[in-house]
Amino acid sequence: MSRRKKGFTNYEINKNIAKILVLHRVWDGLNQTKIAKDLNVSFQQIQKYEKCMNRISAEMLIDICNKRKWDITLFMNNKPESILDELIKNVNQMDPKSSPYPLRISQITEKWDKIDKVGKDNYYYKHHFTKGN
């Protein structure tokens, strides 16, 4: 399998993009249906991006970021965990009782755990690679 800069495999790149997509969506309190409507695709398509079943195109990623006013540079060469850590630092300065973010942080990490568990199998099955490459 080809390698990218910094030693990321194609799967790792797609997994990080999926995790960052989940992070932004959940952090903003959005569901997959809302994102899908914004992009004129089915919610199943968003689901497939988030499960690493389909690769998201650059055009679609740009479209999502423009419509949701997300910083596209966060999707490039960033570890999702470091982005979440920065968001958590900002939340820690708020009153946790009046903030929806502690629950959202929990939802994000739960969804990330699912990506870690099934994402690689989904990716390799979909793209006809052999596990372990």
Where are the regions a protein language model picked out?
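A short, Lys/Arg-rich alpha-helix, primarily the initiator
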Residues: 2-27
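Short basic helix-loop element that most often maps to the first helix and adjoining turn
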Residues: 19-34, 63, 95
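Residue-level detection of the helix-turn-helix DNA-binding "recognition helix"
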Residues: 26, 40, 51-53, 80
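Short alpha-helical DNA-recognition segment
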Residues: 28-48
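Short, basic-rich loop-to-helix N-cap that marks the start of a DNA-contacting helix
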Residues: 53-66
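Short, charged recognition helix plus adjacent turn
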Residues: 76-114
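C-terminal regulatory/oligomerization modules of transcriptional regulators
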Residues: 110-133
